[in-house]
Amino acid sequence: MNRAAIYPGSFDPLTNGHLAIIQRGLNLFDRLVVAVANNPQKSPMFTVDERKALIREAVGNDPRVEVDSFDGLMVDYARTRGIPKVLRGLRAVSDFEYEFQLANMNKKLLPEFESVFVMTGEDYFFVSARLVREVAQFGGNVEGLVPANVLEALQRKLGRPPRS
């Protein structure tokens, strides 16, 4: 049986918390599609193509991981791909409320849709891509919060190395 799930997100940038969820997802599913959301209402630091490349480099050559992107509703993307399962990471109880509402809306739009929630490890429960961006933009050190290739990309994008 080929069990697959979609792990959607903006991944702007990819964090070690995201990587931890990918690893947990691979323990639950045979295949994982990491789907980068293209949201025209946001002003991302990295383009969709840059984010996809950073994710590919960070996950290495694992054949169980596919990196893709989508526009619009994630549930429509899931329907198009024929993968009605989504993997979501939870950092705190506050994440659950939003994710619970989203899961129920997705289920309403696509009845066969299932959401699978996994907790982020204790090392990364406080890490969000938004906080990483803010800290990096102000010259703070985000080493250990993002993969090495993402740290280098942040430094290039911002034109300076982070403070120690």
From Swiss-Prot:
Name of the featured protein: Phosphopantetheine adenylyltransferase
Enzyme class name: transferase
Residues where ATP binds: 10-11, 18, 89-91, 99, 124-130
Catalytic reactions of this protein: (R)-4'-phosphopantetheine + ATP + H(+) = 3'-dephospho-CoA + diphosphate
Required cofactor(s): Mg(2+)
Superkingdom: Bacteria
Similarity-based family: Belongs to the bacterial CoaD family.
This enzyme's EC code(s): 2.7.7.3
Site (Transition state stabilizer): 18
